[in-house]
């Protein structure tokens, strides 16, 4: 220990010192020193280095000594904290170290102010106790040096050149910083790292192939470092020199004699901004014109002599480009067509045409429906007339057929009765009997069919039998017409169904049987009592 120890501590005999050292021998009880193994401090900030002793029962902390290990292995005292005499700071640390908890024997921590790079190293906290002796603990301190990044633009960028340096970003710190780029511009970058005794520097360069679209685009260098609470950014705006194509505008709407305020404009973008010159190829510029920037303005009304081919030349140090325009001046102002009015008029005309077409269509459809209705009525009337005529014909045919059949049956019956006695031959009698049975069966069949047809057609009104205004004599005359002899009896009855009802006036029904009404002309068939 240094000379200061003798001044601060009372004289201690060699016997007492040996006794203190033996107390921590195997089997003895010793305390524990608590501290951090490693700590970091940002350059220029304060850092607290803890050292706390957990004493056992009967132990007493006399003082705490802070030492820094040197490169040659020697320890250098920087602070001594005594429970009775206070703190002493040594050498270059004087004024930069203070006690963390003054007059607290158990807490031997110190605060190092305004940390600098030479403060990096290994520190030793030694606790002197009685009667246990000394206890040591080491602490590694690292000082972070945040970088101060810088960004430098490359040489001027010109459109059409090859790969060119756009910007370079450099940052130096401890430990080495990390550099990245943020941009919408397409390009490549290279990074180089350089080591220094107490720091490291990093340089990153960004390369592009210049185009006019890059002009004005941001290019940002992003620096990351443990000493930063957040990333740092440095932005550079790219400047690309170029000259765009030239065009003359302003005469497209048509110039005419007497037009006021006529102007021509020369459009040509570029970086730097180009300068403009005006001329007329077929002569000098007209009088009373003013050139202001990229505009050629006529200060008077136009005349026919102002026509010609005008030329504009733009230059900005990168190059020179020009363009021409032929200006024609009409004698009179061209009639302008109001597109809005034309559109509205067209819409109105189209609407009117559509309405007319709609009305005509409705009229034609209505007329067509009326014609169809009329034709349908005529058809119905025609069919009704034909139906009445067919009904009369069927009625006449049925009446005549019925009368003829009755007369034939009556005659056959009379002949059968008159010659019954003369026919003695059994075979002839048998044939006559069978013939009579067949006739009886035919008559009954005809009556049954007549009854069925009468029931089905009972709903037919009597008015259908004859036309309006037809006299009974006409009906009787039609009934006297002879039927078609080639038409079978059964078919006659079927064909004249609508007029059976009139003929059935001579019959009546009894227990499901059709019986003829008694009359003077009635005859009996086959002797069975059926009156026809």
From Swiss-Prot:
Membrane topology reported for the UniProt record: Single-pass type I membrane protein
Gene3D superfamilies for the chain: Immunoglobulins
Pfam families: C2-set_2 (PF08205), Ig_3 (PF13927), V-set (PF07686)
Domain Ig-like V-type stretches: 31-142
GO cellular component, one term: plasma membrane
Alphabetical list of SUPFAM superfamilies matching this protein: Immunoglobulin
PROSITE patterns: IG_LIKE (PS50835)
Positions in the Cytoplasmic compartment: 366-532
CDD domains the record matches: IgC1_2_Nectin-3-4_like, IgV_1_Nectin-4_like
Keywords for this protein: Cell adhesion, Cell membrane, Disulfide bond, Glycoprotein, Immunoglobulin domain, Membrane, Repeat, Signal, Transmembrane, Transmembrane helix
The keyword Ligase belongs to this UniProt entry's keyword annotation: no
Gene Ontology BP terms: cell adhesion; symbiont entry into host cell
Domain Ig-like C2-type: 146-235, 244-328
SMART domains on file: IG, IGc2
Region described as Disordered: spans on this chain: 152-179, 453-491
Ranges per topology, Extracellular: 31-344
Record-annotated disulphide pairs: 51-125, 169-221, 266-312
Intracellular or extracellular location(s): Cell membrane
Keyword Translocase: no
Functional summary from the UniProt entry: May be involved in cell adhesion.
Family the entry assigns: Belongs to the nectin family.
Protein name: Nectin-4
Organismal lineage: Eukaryota, Metazoa, Chordata, Craniata, Vertebrata
């Amino acid at each position: 220990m240094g000379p200061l120890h003798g001044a601060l501590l009372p004289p201690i005999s060699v016997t007492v010192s040996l006794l203190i050292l033996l107390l921590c021998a195997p089997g003895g009880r010793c305390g524990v020193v608590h501290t951090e193994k490693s700590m970091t401090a940002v350059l220029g900030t304060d850092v607290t280095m803890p050292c706390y002793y957990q004493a056992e029962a009967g132990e007493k902390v006399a003082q705490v000594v802070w030492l820094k290990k040197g490169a040659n292995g020697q320890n250098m005292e920087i602070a001594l904290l005594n429970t009775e005499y206070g703190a002493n700071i040594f050498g270059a640390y004087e004024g930069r170290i203070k006690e963390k908890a003054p007059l607290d024997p158990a807490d031997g921590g110190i605060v190092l102010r305004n940390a600098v790079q030479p403060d990096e190293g290994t520190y030793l906290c030694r606790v002197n106790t009685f009667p246990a002796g000394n206890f040591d603990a080491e602490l590694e301190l690292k000082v972070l040096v945040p970088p101060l990044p810088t960004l430098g633009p490359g040489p001027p960028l010109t459109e059409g050149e090859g790969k060119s340096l756009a910007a370079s970003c450099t940052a130096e710190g401890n430990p080495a910083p990390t550099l990245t780029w943020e941009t919408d511009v397409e390009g490549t970058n290279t990074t180089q790292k350089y080591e220094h005794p107490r720091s490291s520097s990093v340089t990153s360069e960004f390369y592009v192939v210049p185009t006019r679209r890059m002009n004005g685009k941001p290019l940002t260098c992003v620096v990351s470092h443990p000493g930063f609470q957040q990333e740092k950014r440095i932005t550079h705006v790219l400047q690309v020199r170029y000259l765009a194509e030239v065009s003359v505008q302003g005469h497209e709407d048509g110039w005419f004699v007497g037009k006021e305020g006529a102007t021509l404009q020369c459009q040509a973008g570029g970086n730097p901004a180009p300068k403009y010159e005006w001329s007329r190829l077929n002569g000098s510029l007209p009088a009373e014109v003013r050139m202001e920037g990229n505009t050629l303005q006529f200060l008077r009304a136009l005349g026919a002599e102002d026509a010609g081919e005008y030329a504009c030349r733009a230059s900005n140090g990168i190059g020179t480009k020009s363009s021409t325009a032929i200006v024609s001046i009409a004698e009179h102002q061209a009639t302008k067509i109001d597109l809005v009015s034309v559109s509205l008029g067209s819409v109105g005309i189209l609407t009117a045409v559509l309405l007319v077409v709609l009305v005509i269509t409705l009229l034609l459809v209505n007329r067509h429906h009326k014609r169809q209705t009329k034709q349908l009525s005529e058809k119905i009337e025609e069919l009704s007339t034909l139906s009445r005529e067919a009904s009369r014909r069927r009625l006449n045919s049925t009446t005549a057929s019925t009368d003829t059949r009755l007369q034939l049956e009556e005659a056959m019956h009379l002949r059968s009765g008159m010659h019954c006695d003369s026919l003695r031959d059994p075979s002839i009698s048998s044939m006559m009997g069978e013939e009579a049975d067949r006739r009886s069966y035919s008559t009954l069949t005809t009556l049954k069919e007549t009854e069925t047809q009468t029931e089905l057609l009972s709903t037919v009104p009597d008015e259908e039998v004859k036309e309006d205004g037809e006299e009974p004599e006409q009906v009787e005359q039609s009934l006297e017409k002879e039927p078609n002899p080639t038409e079978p009896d059964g078919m006659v009855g079927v064909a004249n169904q609508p007029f059976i009802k009139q003929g059935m006036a001579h019959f009546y029904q009894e227990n499901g049987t059709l019986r003829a009404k008694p009359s003077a002309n009635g005859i009996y068939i086959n002797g069975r009592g059926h009156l026809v």
